Amino acid sequence: MNSTKTEPAGVSDDTEARCQIVRTLDIVGEKWSLLIVRDALRGSTRFSEFRDSLGAPSDILTTRLAKLVDAGVLEKRAYREPGSRERSSYHLTESGRGLSLVMGALVQWGDTYNPYSGGKSSKLVDTEGHEEVSLAFIHPSGRALTTEEVTLVPGPASRIRW
């Protein structure tokens, strides 16, 4: 997939096309899409695994998987179990693995601002020591910043001034 996409599908307004958030939501903003990515990050690769975990209708799941493949988030691979027909499995690409930061931010936000009374259903841990980690904005000096110390400003491609 071209990483410098200028006209995302479904976005006709040039101002919207310039916005990274609009372009990203065009790919993963529909119901089920981020949940498919979540399950793929947890190791799911087969249609039946996604269907059973999510409870998504098969036609919608098929559409979302195809869209994520077309967008370069997932890669479709053929496999065949002995005595069965050929099927497809779905694997995260580099782009898809990059969404782990988004998923981590959603987990962290949910734990902080919308916690479940029964405790955490997911935790962010490092792969070696399995110690819990958190996401942060890091200043070039290496210092972690609070959300009050970070703001969103127009970039060079923006046509608006805030």
Regions found by a protein language model. Give the residues of each.
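Short beta-strand "wing" residues that participate in macromolecule-binding interfaces
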Residues: 76
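Acidic donor-binding segment of Leloir-type glycosyltransferases
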Residues: 69
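Basic, amphipathic "hinge/linker" alpha-helix immediately C-terminal to the N-terminal HTH DNA-binding motif
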Residues: 29, 81-103
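C-terminal regulatory/oligomerization modules of transcriptional regulators
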Residues: 2-5, 104-162
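Short, Lys/Arg-enriched N-terminal segment that forms or immediately precedes the first helix
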Residues: 5-25
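Glycine-centered, phosphate/nucleic-acid-interacting loop/turn motifs that mediate DNA/RNA or nucleotide
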Residues: 72-73
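N-terminal helix-turn-helix DNA-binding core of bacterial DNA-binding proteins
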Residues: 19-60
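Short, hydrophobic-biased segments on the C-terminal half of alpha helices
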Residues: 65-66
